[in-house]
Amino acid sequence: MIRRPPLSLLDLEAAPLGSRWALTAVLDALPWNSDGLIAAIAQQHDSGEVLMLAWMNRQALGETLASGQACYWSRSRRCLWRKGESSGHRQRLIEARLDCDGDAVLLLVDQQGPACHTGRPNCFYNAIRDGAVEVISSPLKDSRHDS
């Protein structure tokens, strides 16, 4: 049974295993920031590699869920950003999950090519080590940047 009444995120915390809520009711309860955004973390579904952090508005999240392809909100361009639209480096959605506070969404994806606009496999290639920042990943060969 899918529950449809207005809810708070505390209802989800207290819900027993297998409880289901209408998506619109949950989206209405999320603490979208003042710009109407929520943090979105993309993770490779089979390896667990964290690929990137981006932002989603409700429209981007809805499009991602409907199309099965990651769509984000570009804060700099102020428009929807369909990941891989220009580069071909798409993220096929396997599953979406909300964190306990409802202020972040985890996208388990199948990444096609590099995830980072620099051509690297992920956006976390600057390691903070021993008081310095060290670049730990090179761009992949034949990568087309995603802008």
Curated annotation (Swiss-Prot):
The keyword Secreted does not apply. Pathway: Amino-acid biosynthesis; L-histidine biosynthesis; L-histidine from 5-phospho-alpha-D-ribose 1-diphosphate: step 3/9. Zn(2+) binds at C100, C116, C123. GO terms for molecular function: magnesium ion binding; phosphoribosyl-AMP cyclohydrolase activity; zinc ion binding. Its EC number is 3.5.4.19. One of its GO terms (biological process) is L-histidine biosynthetic process. This is Phosphoribosyl-AMP cyclohydrolase 2. It comes from Pseudomonas fluorescens (strain ATCC BAA-477 / NRRL B-23932 / Pf-5).
